[in-house]
Amino acid sequence: MIMTAAIICMAGIQMMAQPKLPYRNASLPIEERVSDLLSRMTLEEKVGQLRCTLAWNYYDIKGNKVVPSSTFMKDIAEGNIGMLWATYRACPWTRKSLATGLTPTLAAKAGNALQRYVIEHTRLGIPLFLAEEAPHG
């Protein structure tokens, strides 16, 4: 038990000692951060940032909580997604209403849950662009 605790502490100390990657360092100039991030991205990741998917099925409501759906987790694991569209929509097209979809409070929780998942479960942790009517420019 003591050995396990010591190993966990050492791993935590080692992780804290690692320097922050330039693209994650808010004190650096934006141009330097962007250049660093682009140099780390694969072609697939760059193309993936242009990918926009319909997202009204990317969350599950569990009481007063919202969590990423298994569909969302699968899509994130299988490929790069840079933008979600229609995440918050309630209309006949999505078959969601304020009763079956997201209230304003749940919409905020959904956005946070999806962003957190992508940041924590992708290689570079690039946040999503969330939009409702972005296709019009």
Locate predicted features.
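Bacterial N-terminal signal peptides
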Residues: 2-12
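Bacterial Sec-dependent signal peptides at the C-terminal "C-region" and cleavage site
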Residues: 10-20
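N-terminal beta-rich core of secreted/periplasmic extracellular enzymes
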Residues: 18-137
